[in-house]
């Protein structure tokens, strides 16, 4: 498309993340524009976050359905505060959702640009994938670092391992955490839907050691095999710093989404 600024490799983008808007929704809800994504509420959500002083907007995954006549990039204004927006494109079909590119929209000197990549893995077979994970740590992690933040998409946090045979702690056998540069203060971890296994919380705590924030946000609406909702009434996000949970309350709004704001100073 003419006029687009699209980066295929490291965007040379530098941001100091200080205030993060965290946005989630029920992914079964169809909005007034007919789509089960964020596109209907996105302009108002971004305006609200900008007014609240956020420099970063992190949306739960399955974020935007790409389609003819809808293109977010050229519509982004010169916000006073927002410098980075993270969303995932996806297909919404009768048989379920299919994830596409993860897209980082970021402010460059000459306007908004976009940087695309795909989730590298979710579940891990440690016997079969050790070499793959080592390559991810060495090659892919550097491409996910944007100034003071790094992005791990959904189950990529499984790149650190729960030692179920030994001391029952989390370890880093393939160097995924070690590959994140020391200057990174925030790990952004957008998620598709709620991960209920106990070790996911342990892995987020582990990744947050050393004073980093780990921000995870997911969609509500996940159902079990009997059709019962698995989310309950809890918040659709967690935040940890240095192994401890950081509370982030809901921001009241009438936009049909759930919003929290984290001061990562």
Which functions belong to the PLM regions below?
Residues 6-33, 147-158, 188-190:
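Active-site-proximal beta-strand elements of phosphoester/diester hydrolases
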Residues 62-85, 90, 97, 160-261:
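CN hydrolase (nitrilase-like) catalytic-core segments centered on the catalytic cysteine
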Residues 16-71:
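Short, conserved active-site loops that position catalytic residues or coordinate cofactors/metal ions
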Residues 2, 94-185, 255-265:
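Active-site catalytic loop in hydrolytic enzyme cores
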Residues 14-16, 47-53, 77-79, 143-146, ...:
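Flexible, charged surface loops at secondary-structure boundaries
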